[in-house]
Amino acid sequence: MNSLSVKTQFGWITAIEANGKIIRVKFDKNNKNSKTKSLIKFKKSLNNYFKKKKSIVFNYKIRGNKIQKKVWGELKKIPFGKTKSYGEIAKKFKISPRHVGKICAQNKIPMAIPCHRVIRSDGSLGGFTARGGIKLKKKLLKFES
């Protein structure tokens, strides 16, 4: 496995790659940096995100069951600067909002699968399991608005 850490205004973000695809994104620093094609694309995409150009797009592979993949696919459709509620997503798949939250918490590719854009129906933030937690979620949403 290869990895690359990028320093951002929100701290370090590290991508881990295997077989040419990103398999994990973490909000911390890894001291072992590689420069594979997919990691370089990740870094460019991250830099574009922080220039407020667009959402993050890169090749990744994520494991999950059928409903997880459907929910994660729906999260990818939430545009930069917008949010959806756990309930809105839950209705589409006939599952509970809590189940959507659990699926968000299992997301190994935050930013590309923007679980930070999912909030409670009352407008409060809900949870965020990435390092930095709810404070980081709030910063990301503020940055995107």
Regions found by a protein language model. Name each.
Residues M111-R120:
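Short Lys/Arg-enriched helix C-cap and helix-to-coil transition segments
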Residues M1-I95, F143:
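Basic nucleic-acid-binding alpha-helical/helix-turn surface characteristic of O6-alkylguanine DNA
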Residues L75, C115-H116, L140:
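Structural signal for hydrophobic
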Residues S124-S145:
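…primarily DNA-binding HTH/wHTH and HhH modules…
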Residues C104:
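DNA major-groove recognition helix of helix-turn-helix
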Residues F58-G64, R120-S121, G127-A130:
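Generic structural "secondary-structure junction" signal
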Residues N107:
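The DNA-recognition helices of helix-turn-helix-type DNA-binding domains
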